[in-house]
Swiss-Prot record:
It is found in: Cell inner membrane. It comes from Campylobacter jejuni subsp. jejuni serotype O:23/36 (strain 81-176). It comes from the Bacteria. Residues 2-236 form the ABC transporter domain. The keyword Transmembrane applies. InterPro entries: AAA+_ATPase (IPR003593), ABC3_permease_C (IPR003838), ABC_transporter-like_ATP-bd (IPR003439), ABC_transporter-like_CS (IPR017871), MacB-like_ATP-bd (IPR017911), MacB_PCD (IPR025857), Macrolide_Exporter_MacB (IPR050250), P-loop_NTPase (IPR027417). Non-canonical ABC transporter that contains transmembrane domains (TMD), which form a pore in the inner membrane, and an ATP-binding domain (NBD), which is responsible for energy generation. Confers resistance against macrolides. Homodimer. Belongs to the ABC transporter superfamily. Macrolide exporter (TC 3.A.1.122) family. Keywords: Antibiotic resistance, ATP-binding, Cell inner membrane, Cell membrane, Membrane, Nucleotide-binding, Translocase, Transmembrane, Transmembrane helix, Transport. One of its GO terms (biological process) is response to antibiotic. This is Macrolide export ATP-binding/permease protein MacB.
Length: 641
């Protein structure tokens, strides 16, 4: 079963083992005896594949161990070797049953099978009443029996016992030795390390070692051969194995988080703030953008203004005129929903003893709908008003507020105001326009454009033509077509256009840029939180080094250890993300309750993005600590206090 030839182990210039050669047959009960520093524990660690010899040959069950990789050695420990340690090496967060079941988890056995086997083993060792007890609730003898049960969980063809009675009282020590003798009688191969000759005398073969060399090798009787040993087959990673690994990792991660509540919460704080920031920033951006777009919609969506000149501020624009012929040409275009004229002039509005600087806006019937103006009382202009150049006016909110400060809108209908000495009957009052990007204090009277031309300015030319494009038509294509048609009609391009969609796109682009910049701040907060997670995971690896060594000793592969700490990092980040989302929902609710300017809009995609990014942060910042844990040397890890 075990064949060692010329095994040497050097640490620096110190020779721990010197050309050790021995063979152990299956079913033997061997005691390796020697004083402290003799090399007996180093020899046991090499036999148990926890350590690697500096030179020599080691064959276990027809496999040359010195040529196996780390995962193959882990499989050998998992399937054929059981360890019994002097200090028990039970995981403090797990119950007795869970500790015993652990090797079967890494072997890919199902939960029910693991549970039944663990109960049977503990029952055989008279611990049926301690299944759910944690190690700190057990006596030393009971803990050692749990350790023995764990060693037998996957069969334990070879039991390696390192000073198994060293930390026990004499009664418990005798019980442990009796258990080992019974196991040997059943066919298990036992290799026991001790410094006590009385304990060594219980074995059927005693090997004495001193200063790294074998002094004597005494056999008492032939070895038992009751076990039918299996040769190692190629390991397959089944779905059950992966499920068991993941479940165990989640359980350990959850227990670890609960065991250090305050530390875990402080670690999550960075993630919570980062995720809440991401969700709130997106909600704020969506809310403000929706408000602006709504305002633009009320100001007039898909609208195009045509004005004389080559652009805003053109000094020669006064020499250029738009006329009714241009207006009729545009009205004939089928892709335009509405077309109307617009002119204005400044003057003085008077009512009784109140006189104000004001502007008369000469508009048509469609202008109110095109510009998104909403009536508060009365009516808007109709076709008869425009056709007959009637002296009627619709006051805006500023005009009503300044000319009739203490009266309701409906009470001033029918009254007459003067504009540049011309009387105008009030037929309507507009609502306050809260959707303008920039609020102004201009007093406006909306009158028929024909009235403005015929009775106020005498100018038959139009200052502006405003059109509304149909919803199913691209405003950009419509604008290009209008420019081309008017250019052909007028013989030159002596006019310019302003498309409301250009303003809308500029606002949207500006909001997008602002959102991206603010999101960058939130991402930085997430990264800071991720660094906090990495820091605490490094601390966790340092604190749990011994646990890692124990898991490796019972057969955990490096990928099992790595998965465990990665899942723990991801779990911390995910819980932090969920708490961050909950916090953001409260913030959004509070903001929407207290603020009337614009709402914060919770977006499902931002929540999903937050959760996914937190998992990504967990993987990225958990990888380095997890890799450190997976690369630990089992012997160094087990010796860590």
């Amino acid at each position: 079963m075990i064949f060692l030839k010329n095994i040497c182990k050097n640490i620096g210039e110190n020779a721990i083992l010197k050309n050790v050669s021995l063979s152990i047959e299956k079913g033997e009960f061997v005691a390796i005896i020697g004083q402290s520093g003799s090399g007996k524990t180093s020899l046991l660690n090499i036999i148990g594949t926890l350590d690697t010899p500096s030179s020599g040959t080691y064959v276990f069950d027809e496999y040359e161990v010195t040529k196996l990789n780390n995962d193959e050695k882990a499989r050998l420990r998992r399937e054929k070797i059981g360890f019994i340690f002097q200090r028990y090496n039970l995981l403090s967060l797990l119950s007795a049953k869970e500790n015993v079941s652990l090797p079967a988890v890494y072997a890919g056995k199902k939960l029910q099978e693991r549970s039944q086997n663990a109960k049977k083993l503990l029952n055989d060792l008279e611990l049926a009443h301690k299944l759910d007890s944690k190690p700190n609730e057990l006596s030393g003898g009971q803990q050692q029996r749990v350790s023995i049960a764990r060693a037998l969980m996957n069969g334990g063809e070879l039991i390696l016992a390192d000073e198994p009675t060293g930390a026990l009282d004499s009664k418990s020590g005798i019980m442990v030795l009796e258990i080992l003798q019974k196991l040997n009688a059943q066919g298990h191969t036992i290799v026991l390390v001790t410094h006590d000759p009385k304990i060594a005398a219980q074995a059927k073969r005693v090997i004495e070692i001193k200063d790294g060399e074998i002094l004597s090798d005494t056999k008492k009787e032939k070895a038992q051969e009751k076990l039918t040993l299996k040769t190692m087959s190629k390991e397959k990673k089944t779905l059950t194995l992966l499920k068991n690994q993941a479940f165990e990792c989640f359980k350990i991660a959850y227990s670890s988080i609960l065991a250090h509540k305050l530390r875990s919460i402080l670690t999550m704080l960075g993630i919570i703030i980062g995720i809440a920031s991401v969700v709130c920033v997106v909600a704020l951006g969506l809310g403000s953008q929706a408000k602006v777009l709504e305002s633009i919609a009320r100001l007039g969506t898909n609208t195009i203004e045509i004005r004389p000149g080559r652009g805003f501020g053109d000094l020669r624009s006064g020499k250029t005129r738009l006329n009714f012929s241009d207006l009729e040409t545009l009205r004939s275009l089928e892709y335009l929903e509405a077309v109307d004229a617009h002119s204005n002039t400044s003057g003085v509005a008077t009512y009784t003893n109140i006189s104000l600087s004001a502007r008369a806006e000469g508009v048509g019937v469609n202008n109110f709908a095109i510009e998104g103006l909403r009536i508060d009382a009365g009516r808007i202009l109709n076709n008869d008003d425009v056709k007959n150049s009637t002296n009627v006016a619709v006051l805006d909110f500023n005009a009503k507020k300044n000319l009739f400060p203490d009266e309701k809108s409906e009470n001033i209908l029918g009254r007459v105001v003067l504009f540049n000495s011309q009387p105008f009957k009030i037929i309507g009052v507009l609502q306050k326009d809260t959707d303008k990007p920039i609020e102004d204090n201009v007093v406006r009277l909306y009158i028929p454009y024909t009235t403005l031309m015929n009775k106020l300015t005498g100018d038959r030319n139009l200052r502006e033509i405003i059109v509304k494009v149909k919803d199913d038509v691209s405003s950009t294509l419509a604008e290009n077509a209008i420019i081309r048609i008017l250019e052909i009609k007028r013989g030159q391009k002596d006019f310019f256009t302003f498309n409301s969609d250009t303003f809308k796109q500029a606002i949207t682009a500006n909001k997008r840029t602002t959102t991206i910049l603010t999101a960058c701040v939130a991402v930085i907060a997430l990264i800071v939180g991720g660094i906090g997670v990495m820091n605490i995971m490094l601390v966790s690896v340092s604190e749990r080094t011994r646990e890692i060594g124990i898991r490796m000793a019972i057969g955990a592969r490096r990928e099992d250890i790595m998965m465990q700490f990665l899942i723990e990092a991801v779990m911390i980040c995910t819980i932090g993300a969920i708490l961050g989302v909950i916090l953001s929902i409260f913030v959004i609710f509070a903001f929407n309750t207290l603020s009337t300017d614009f709402p914060m809009i919770l977006n499902a995609y931002s929540v999903l993005l937050g959760l996914l990014s937190s998992m990504f942060i967990g993987v990225v910042f958990g990888f380095f600590p997890a890799r450190n844990a997976a690369n630990l040397n089992p012997i160094s890890a087990l010796s860590k206090e």
